[in-house]
Amino acid sequence: YFYHNTAECDFNMGREKRNYWHRYSTYRTDAGDVDLFLIAGPSIRDIIERYTDLTGKSVMLPKAALGYLGSSMYYPELPENSDDAVLEFIDTTHEEDIPVDGFQLSSGYCAVETEQGIKRCTFTWNNKRFKDPADWFAQMVKRGIIVSPNIKPGMLLVHPLLEEMKAKDMFLPASDDNAGVDGLAVGTWWGGPGLFVDFTKQSTREHWKQYIKDALLRYGCRSLWNDNCEYDSMVDKDAKVYFEGKGSTIGTMKPVMSNLMCQLSNEAIEEYDPNCRPFSVCRSGHAGIQRYAQVWAGDNLTHWDTLKYNIATILGMALCGVSNHGC
């Protein structure tokens, strides 16, 4: 069964027992219609093939996506010279004959000074940690590394670009029953309250791609890590969503935002460098996310137990059509 609906929902897979009838399953959704697809087999492989006929096949990623992609919050969080520390890490892997093809750059690179202290602010650079982003990207490319900087769809209320983005009408409006801030919906975010970008509006999508180009691609970046895009911290589930002029709520459209964010990352890279094959990484997504990104399952520990859990997670995601998955 494929229940095609983007609103928050609940599955009861036989967990309730009654004396009057046999175990049963239920599906409930908060809003919208349900397109229910019954996908015939007979084999699991046949079902997955037909499911991806509906939702889309996996995006063709660059070869680097198949290799070891290093990642650590430690290096970008250093008080200074994070750029040198990452280069030293890559050099060490080469010296130890550990093949590495990419590096996921966590959000410490954009943690800048604000009126409330150091805060993560997407589309900015901490120049104490990364002195010359263009030179650093060039050094990483020279070492054969594709870098995926972390970007987030939420902007703290102390973000230096917040007023500029508000003037461009990029954020979700608050619901009628919630005043928000200047009429905009406020959610909890890394470091405090923030506003969330509405990717269902064409003008916002164009502005977002331009920010990507100006803050990252012009320095040599050709891959993006789309993070924290679940919109789960948007407590006001009735916050308004533009939805191409038709109007909706974030409670109904939440998973669509992840897919759109990844689609925009790919479009921005393709527009900036038509000869480049985009590589997007994402932590969440709706059915069809495989068309745009490689998905990861969130933070884990460097431990053998994690590896055991990862195998089950990767296989489970593949059964959902997401073959390009890493943990």
Predicted segments with their positions:
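Catalytic-domain carbohydrate-binding cleft regions of carbohydrate-active enzymes
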Residues: 1-327
